Amino acid sequence: MRPILLQGHERSITQIKYNRDGDLLFTVAKDPVVNVWYSVNGERLGTYNGHTGAVWCVDVDWETRHVLSGSADNSCRLWDCETGKQLALLQTNSAVRTCGFDFGGNIIMFSTDKQMGYQCFVSFIDLRDPSQIEDNEPYMKIPCSESKITSAVWGPLGENIIAGHENGELNHYSAKSGEIVNSIKEHSKQINDIQTSRDMTMFVTASKDCTSKLFDSTSLEHQKTFRTERPVNSAAVSPIYDHVVLGGGQEAMDVTTTSTRIGKFEARFFHVAFEEEFGRVKGHFGPINSLAFHPDGKSYSSGGEDGYVRIHYFDPQYFDFEFES
């Protein structure tokens, strides 16, 4: 499995995201650039320039018309996907940690960090109402006083968002009323990443407590647990098989103080039903920060602390593989 190496960032990767068709791959890092690549051959299509700080999150809508990015320069920006033109600039009081389009691409949500005396907020803006963008006035802002949000995605049908917190909590926030509909605490440490399955019925979390867990999207019921020996930074669900891929590794500041075994940085494949690991892919120099499966399930990509993004196309053996418990 020879990976395609994408080198378009000077700093460590923070998030990577495929569009719905899977022909484009969006990458952001701790530098101010948002990159977009052709996933088939790794050719860089272009960049979205405008941010002045590290970019923490990126999302693309269902029709690949708009791109959304959130940055440590205290702004969330909306871009025209095709031309790279900035369509909207939403100023915030603190860094934007997560962002996302809803199912129809009309409503965006983004969450801000708890820093510099400001509280963590989740904001919802309806793009069909120009006044909300011009006045920088979201139709709803939900304060999170307890623990800040570290990862968030839209739930099924755009009715609510699933948010993971610094203390390991998972919450369902209603996109209409802003109330917490459901709450669960299955992780003991920070939730680094949440990704839904292709049909949005399940989602997988990645946590600093060295586990990744599978949950039901509507009830938040805990289904499966995948255990590792090191913090998990990202996890993704295969769209065609009962597989999840986990990526992680020690934080950069802890690397010199731990044994080399804990500092390993492979992508690890687990079977969903049996919770068993069945494969590993080496490659990155340093921890893996973000993972994404291609929507057709025939390849996956990983972004690392080394600033590289690797696109891996699976070998034929992967598709013939039968898991025996």
Swiss-Prot record:
GO CC annotations on file: eukaryotic 43S preinitiation complex; eukaryotic 48S preinitiation complex; eukaryotic translation initiation factor 3 complex; eukaryotic translation initiation factor 3 complex, eIF3m
PROSITE patterns from the UniProt entry: WD_REPEATS_1, WD_REPEATS_2, WD_REPEATS_REGION
Compartment(s) where it occurs, according to its Swiss-Prot or TrEMBL record: Cytoplasm
GO biological process, one term: formation of cytoplasmic translation initiation complex
Primary subcellular site in the record, as a coarse category: cytoplasm
MF term (GO), any: translation initiation factor activity
SUPFAM superfamilies linked to this entry: WD40 repeat-like
WD-type repeats, residues: 8-47, 50-91, 144-183, 186-225, 283-324
Keyword tags: Cytoplasm, Initiation factor, Protein biosynthesis, Repeat, WD repeat
Keyword Cytoplasm on entry: yes
Functional description taken from the UniProt entry: Component of the eukaryotic translation initiation factor 3 (eIF-3) complex, which is involved in protein synthesis of a specialized repertoire of mRNAs and, together with other initiation factors, stimulates binding of mRNA and methionyl-tRNAi to the 40S ribosome. The eIF-3 complex specifically targets and initiates translation of a subset of mRNAs involved in cell proliferation.
Subunit description: Component of the eukaryotic translation initiation factor 3 (eIF-3) complex, which is composed of 13 subunits: eif3a, eif3b, eif3c, eif3d, eif3e, eif3f, eif3g, eif3h, eif3i, eif3j, eif3k, eif3l and eif3m.
The family this protein is said to belong to: Belongs to the eIF-3 subunit I family.
Name listed for the protein in its UniProt record: Eukaryotic translation initiation factor 3 subunit I
Originating organism: Xenopus laevis
